[in-house]
Amino acid sequence: MYIGTQLSGDKLEQVGDRYLRQLAQLGIVHVCVDPVGSPYDWTRDILARHMDRIQTAGLVLDMVQLPLSSAGIDKVRSPGIILGQEPDRERELDGICHLIEMLGSLGIKAAKYNFNILGIPRTPSERGRGGAVLSTYRADQVLDAGSVTRAGQVSADQMWERITYFLERVVPVAEASKVRLAC
C-alpha cells in the first residue's frame, strides 16, 4: 500500500522534526511537505536544506505545493493567476515557472496546485470516534449559493480561459524540468 501525507511549511514549524520521525515510524515514506514561507521566496538553497531535513527523518520529499493552494481567493498566494489580472498574473507565472525549474534541478519529481476561487468550503468541525476532530461540511449551514467572493461572478468560460492560460505557460516548463504536475 502506498501511503503519503501533506503538510504546509507553517504547520511543519508547529509540529517540528519529531512529527517527521513519527511519520517514518508509522511506515510513511513519501511526503508532500513545504519549506517555510512563501513559495515565491524559496531559493535552491532553501529547497536543498529542506530536502535534507526530510531525508534526515527517513522520508522522501515527493512533491511541494505551488503557490496555488486550496485556500480560496482571499488567501491564495497567486490571486492574479486565478483572477486573470495583469500584470500580477505574469509576475506570478514567472515565479511559478522558476520554482518548477528549481524543483527539477534538485530532483523533486512533482508539484501540486489547486485552481479554484472558493477554496474548500467547510462548516464548524465536529467530534468523531474517539474524540477525533473532524473536518466537516454540512450543506444546510453553508452561505447562500448566491453569495460571491471578491472575484465576482465568473463564468465557466472565463475560468477555463484562466486555467488554459496557466497550463499553456507552466506545462512546457514542467516537462522540460521533468517535474510532474498534480491538481
Give the location of each predicted region.
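Short coil-to-beta-strand
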Residues: 26, 54-67, 139-143, 179
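Catalytic domains of carbohydrate-active enzymes, especially glycoside hydrolases
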Residues: 15-36, 53-57, 102-111
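Aromatic-lined substrate-binding rim segments of carbohydrate-active enzymes
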Residues: 41-59, 63-64, 98
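Hydrophobic faces of well-ordered beta-strands that scaffold small-molecule active sites
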Residues: 1-7, 29-33, 61-66, 111-113, ...
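Charged/polar interaction segments and conserved charged motifs
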Residues: 1-27, 160-161, 166
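N-terminal substrate-binding region of glycoside hydrolase catalytic domains
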Residues: 25-44, 62, 67-87
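Active-site acidic/histidine proton-transfer and metal-coordination neighborhood
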Residues: 13-17, 80-183
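Acidic-and-aromatic substrate-binding clefts and catalytic sites of carbohydrate-active enzymes
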Residues: 5-18, 34-47, 90, 118-121
